[in-house]
Amino acid sequence: MKPPEHSLIIISGLSGSGKSVALKTFEDLDYYCSDNLPVELLPHFLRCRLRVAELSDQRIAIGIDIRSGSNLSELDQWRHTAKHYNIKAHLLFFEASNETLLKRYADTRRRHPLSHLGLSLPEAIALERELTAPLREAAEAVIDTSTFNVHQLRRHVVTEFALTHSDKLSLLFESFAYKRGVPTEADFVFDARILPNPHWEPELRSLTGRDSNVRDYMEQQPDVILYLRQITEFLDTWLARLQADTRSYVTVAFGCTGGKHRSVYLAEQMARHAREKGWSEVATFHRELE
């Protein structure tokens, strides 16, 4: 029997650059996540984790940064020995401009992890850049988040990293509000505004398409049943063709007025259907809910 193949994403970088958002995104994609793990505990952590699920593929994401101790220089060395555990390890380094980091700290009023050294914020940022420079140099990818908001960063992580460490076709089902614009990166866009709107039901207005009451409402609507059936037939046919054409990933977007009920429901239902059909690399992204 072929041994299970495991994937490890190491998220590092500068404080305030979006590492926590990235780690949470991987968690939402069913990665087993741990933040602020001391570097010296990494081998033990992985051995324990792999022992728990010995016969299944494991997808693990860990956050390691300046808070993780003084042994950051050992991280890249350990990454290259990960194949001993049949692990594909990927090191991602997140950063942002000094101006962006200063603004983010001003907005959140959080303390920098190195502030206990008696440094000003610009000095702490400069020192952190110096201490993490070896990790940046060794990283598989360096992500500058200066121009990203939270939604853009989450989507970038999903499309560029979380779904691309596989030779299989990766599927992203996205919901959005037309009033905020159509996602320019979508391969297929479906307009759900023609469907009955749960927003006009007072007891459903505050809920989303993820909630069971909204699902029950949608599944009682004949037009919704027909809409889903026809889109399912279309995608079942053409996604298989796209995989045969060696596409890496496909984004399918559903839009409605507010991006809260109909589009979310449809994206969730299509993602569930895709998993049931055997697609292993499937994710959802709800732009207006993030």
UniProtKB/Swiss-Prot annotation:
The keyword Nucleotide-binding applies. ATP binds at G13, L14, S15, G16, S17, G18, K19, S20. GO terms for molecular function: ATP binding; GTP binding. The keyword Nucleotide-binding applies. Pfam families: PapZ_C, RapZ-like_N. Gene3D superfamilies: P-loop containing nucleotide triphosphate hydrolases. GTP binds at D65, I66, R67, S68. Keywords: ATP-binding, GTP-binding, Nucleotide-binding. HAMAP family: RapZ_like. Displays ATPase and GTPase activities. Belongs to the RapZ-like family. This is Nucleotide-binding protein XF_1405. The lineage of its organism: Bacteria, Pseudomonadati, Pseudomonadota, Gammaproteobacteria, Lysobacterales.
